[in-house]
Regions:
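ATP-dependent carboxylate-amine ligase
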Residues: 1-169
């Protein structure tokens, strides 16, 4: 995001409420296998992309930059996986025998908890962890502000104590 775009957003957001504004971006990291951590997904590998998130466009676009997408299975946000979904995935694996499954971390957590996931899916499943990065040094401002806010207070549930008051007692 350009500095000009950041200034425009700040101007608009400050009309709503006085608050600090920090700009971040989401950065994908290396794909991970939830069942076999030693396995790796290599750039250019064939993948079947599956997601059950609200707006999968950015996820799919990012995957296409790194891997060869041979099929997509896009589901609704908060999708509850069924045996029919797992059977559909198995059919896609039969059609694309070299493909791996690449999904979001959110969907991988759901599938990892299920006892019904067939071995072929476990063997080929990877997820794409995401990392949040601050844009243009705003992390220093964020962490500096957070440190300043925390330096004067200790929070214990609903009880807030000022450190200076405790020191003087």
């Amino acid at each position: 995001m350009s500095p000009l775009a950041q200034r425009m957003w700040r101007k608009e957001l400050l009309k709503i409420a006085y608050q600090r504004i920090y700009f971040t971006r989401i950065v994908p990291t290396d794909a991970v296998s939830p069942f076999y951590p030693e396995r790796r997904l290599e750039r250019g590998d064939e993948v079947i992309v599956m997601s059950g998130i609200g707006n999968p466009k950015a996820f799919v676009k990012g995957v296409k930059k790194e891997y060869k997408v041979v099929a997509k299975m896009i589901l609704s946000d908060h999708h509850v996986y069924s045996m029919s979904d797992l059977n559909s995935l198995q059919a896609l694996f039969e059609k694309h025998p070299n493909a791996k499954l690449l999904t979001t971390e959110k969907d991988a957590v759901k599938l990892r908890r299920s006892r019904k996931v067939p071995a072929i899916i476990k063997e080929r499943m990877f997820y794409q962890p995401l990392k949040v990065e601050f844009i243009e040094g705003s992390d220093q401002d964020f962490f500096g502000t957070l440190k300043d806010d925390l330096d004067g207070k200790i929070h214990l549930g609903d009880l807030t104590l000022n450190n200076e008051e405790n020191i003087n007692k």
